[in-house]
Amino acid sequence: MSVRVRARRVLSALLTALVVPAVVVAGLSISPAAAHAFSRDGLPVEYLDVYSTSMGRNIRVEFQGGGPKAVYLLDGLRAQDDFNGWDINTAAFEWFYQSGISVVMPVGGQSSFYTDWYSPSALNKQTYTYKWETFLTQELPTYLATNKQISVTGNGVVGLSMSGGAALILAAFHPAQFRFAGSLSGFLNPSTIFMTNAIRVAMLDAGSYSVDNMWGPPWDPAWRRNDPTVQAQALVAAGTRLYIYCAPGGSTPIDDNTDAGVALSASSLESLAVAGNKAFQQAYAAAGGRNATFVFPASGNHSWPYWGQQLQALKGDLIATLNG
């Protein structure tokens, strides 16, 4: 099969995944409006409104104190404006309760890739410019240090799907702040021609956001600046502890109660991510990287049950790294 035919088929799979009426998958697919795993009553979860000078507005942050070090949990492409997807779809606050680690969940940022954009999204007439990297690495850490006694250094960041690559990029360019970075089903080679087009389609579907306002045309340097595979050397040089998970698609017992259409969507999306993860692994090894765990199971889909499972799997490593 030629590369062109394969690319056309994979892009078709992405389009199919985007229009399937999924109710439990997230990231580059359709995520639920209704929550089913909010934090139980009694957990010390706070809802903070943190003013972002760079974006000219308050950003909601879900926060659970637990120690001076924190893990930042980033959301997927269809991030909602009321709660973070990790709280909506998993028991992440419960898992980290009394772990000695604080939990920081920024809310919002649909289609943002948690990056600093060039300008407001033109297609949906966005009224301000996303400046998520600035918020996460300057404004929020300052607020948390002042008000919640969270260290500005030696923390962790974990992302899924859209934010998997963002987590690695944040760690690559801000190594003092993040000594641990995890990517779950992330898109780790976004500057390839195929992925630039796939991301364009996905962002149009998720809120009519314009990728041109984010990183410009495909040849703009911002694409490579925000490509974890290109930046693998920086992660190696910093000695950042990494956890990388991605499956090739295909159902497992986790999907037993999942609608067939939803499972197809999730499988298609996961299969899109795996090539970029393998490319990152190769670049990381070529740069001399020896401080990463790579988890590539034989099957698995692009959905919250898998990401919740992997967050629990990496938890011990994360805590040991932050407390080390």
Predicted feature locations:
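N-terminal export and membrane-targeting signals
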Residues: M1-P21, A34
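Non-catalytic cap/lid and distal C-terminal segments of serine-dependent acyl enzymes
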Residues: S12, T16, G27-G324
